[in-house]
């Protein structure tokens, strides 16, 4: 089949929608730069605007909005000008990438276990972006069986990741307090409930009414995420050591060989990447075999074996200690490369 864009979008209808949405996205992100600067520095909007260059790099959260605005402008250029499907795929990847800067620079990067929360928040943001896009496609185009068949499983996986990531972030932020003991916790409970309803709806038969219900859940999730970013979780108010601030956990005692090779502190990000890498490869192989083509079992075994090594390294004590000693860090790094 042709990879020309005209085959699937001859009138550029989808491109115009994306172009308008990306422009709004970029403009709102630019507006957030002085607003976030003022909020972070305790200034008025006018004070932050007059001396904006000083505050753009004052905190990671302000710089994050600048990155989001730039990525929005990139999508605004790609959406109408791309002539091949590859350009649209690139715009999609940039859109997903733009979901990361804000979540990973918020309160989830503070305090004990923030390594778990940061990874979970980033994965939840990616899952939510993909799943929300699937919902939007169905609402705009209607419950077309051909479209539904292509995007339904993506929405389900994305919604599940959104829910799981949201639970981990809430657990870390509440720091052992009741989830209903403060405003941030209540907001996060609403988020978890909306995500749960979204997951359930994604598995039900498609209809226009259920499509709008799923879009309603997406709206609630996005609204609560935006509102909760302005609230302070209990974890944020707890003092932390330099080690916790940097690593997310206290420095463990001097290791032995057994400790380095035994199960340690897992890395959620690499675990997820490994599982998706294996699942995606097996899915691609199943498509190839469905077409009647052959695929070497040795290739499959090599691919899975490599990801199993990554899972092992991201789960043992060596990974935990590699964050604090350069020699062990390079050992993990070079093993990954090989």
Please give the residue ranges for each predicted region.
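Early transmembrane hairpin module of multi-pass membrane proteins
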Residues: 18, 27-40, 51-69, 246-338
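Polytopic transmembrane helical bundles with strong interfacial aromatic enrichment
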Residues: 2-256
